[in-house]
Amino acid sequence: MSLINMAKREINCKIVYYGIGLCGKTTNLHYLHQAVNPKDVGDMVSIDTETERTLYFDLLPLELGKVHGFQIRFQLYTVPGQVLYQQTRISVLKGADCVIFVADSQASKLQENIESWNELQEQLRRMNKDINDFPLVMQWNKRDLQDILPVSVLEQYLNLYHVPSFESVAVTGKGVIECLRVGINSTLRRLERI
């Protein structure tokens, strides 16, 4: 849920990148940190394990200027994708205004993607979020690799709500900014309705 500070005229929103381990969530944030104007982005904070997998979260603060006289700030988080970090994912997901679900497009990762997607849906339900009204974006990552599933298959198994979806190659930035832009715009539209 967005934090609104009336005294400072600030709105802080939270976007969470969610998906299986090594699907490209942290790579998205690294690309954005390099691509965004330095005056609009803060320092990236990562808590990694020795294998460079995210242990708790990555955080990237992003300022977008003013809307209706309020300074808009987005905090971009990733969750650890490894199965044993479910409680951490739940903690990071709390208060999210938008989720970008990053799916690994490799055929060998379909079942893991489905399990992660099902877990996300369950957690959103437990948080009383209506998936039909909640800002959600699907990102089909690693489109540059061999043995990837057609987008139509990913859509069939993972995009049952027909939310916006993007093909991406996070290591090169393909689709990363477009995906975030839709997440931000969806979040701002929802804020205007509240």
Question: Can you say where each PLM-predicted feature lies in the sequence?
Answer:
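Conserved catalytic network of the ASCE P-loop NTPase/AAA+ motor domain
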Residues: K8, E52-L55, G65-F70, I90-G95, ...
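Conserved C-terminal guanine-recognition region of P-loop GTPase G domains, centered on the G4
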Residues: S105-Y161
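Conserved G1/Walker A P-loop phosphate-binding module
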Residues: S2-T49
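Short, well-ordered amphipathic alpha-helices
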Residues: M1-S2, L32, L59-E63, W117-R125
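Canonical P-loop GTPase G-domain recognition
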Residues: D144-I194
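Conserved nucleotide-binding/hydrolysis micro-motifs of P-loop NTPases
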Residues: L22, Q82, Q106-S108, K142-Q146, ...
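Inter-motif core of Ras-like GTPase G domains
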Residues: Q86-A107
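Switch I (G2) and immediately adjacent beta-strands of P-loop GTPase domains
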Residues: V45-L84
